[in-house]
From Swiss-Prot:
Substrate binds at residues 9, 41, 75, 89. Reversibly transfers an adenylyl group from ATP to 4'-phosphopantetheine, yielding dephospho-CoA (dPCoA) and pyrophosphate. Keywords: ATP-binding, Coenzyme A biosynthesis, Cytoplasm, Magnesium, Nucleotide-binding, Nucleotidyltransferase, Transferase. This is Phosphopantetheine adenylyltransferase. It comes from Bifidobacterium longum subsp. infantis (strain ATCC 15697 / DSM 20088 / JCM 1222 / NCTC 11817 / S12). The keyword Oxidoreductase does not apply. Pathway: Cofactor biosynthesis; coenzyme A biosynthesis; CoA from (R)-pantothenate: step 4/5. Homohexamer.
Amino acid sequence: MTIAVCPGSYDPVTAGHLDVIERSARFFDEVHVVVAVNAAKTPMFSDATRVDVIRRALDKAGCKNVTVSSTDGLITDYCKKVGATVIVKGLRQNGDYEAELGMALVNRKLAGIETLFLPADPILEHISSSIVKDVARHGGDVTGMVPDCVVPMLADALAEERQRKD
């Protein structure tokens, strides 16, 4: 059985993330989507919220061979724990490749785990979690950029953010 891990901060999960996860689920027997803590980022949503939203979106998509969890440790340690032999990452643009290649080489050195890069669907390659949050912060419509369940959640989080600033 081939097990893959799709790590990310998923803050929030986007249509592009889901596309990569769903495509991965067609190639591998089992896929683990892992909400990973990124010390360089301050998340808008808790780990538990991100896990829950991804689960709901994948249930709606009918992905049966996908597990969703979180970790604050090394992704390679998580891979070893679940028996994963590959990490799957989506690539949108050249900048993604440069950033992800270094991590892929470290993961190979640490644990012998290979990274498979899936190119983004051209229709979705402009979407990132940061862009989604920025568009929403400025009153733009993010429908179609994120799963339907994220739209009201994002609006609520931004309303709370505005209240804290006032």
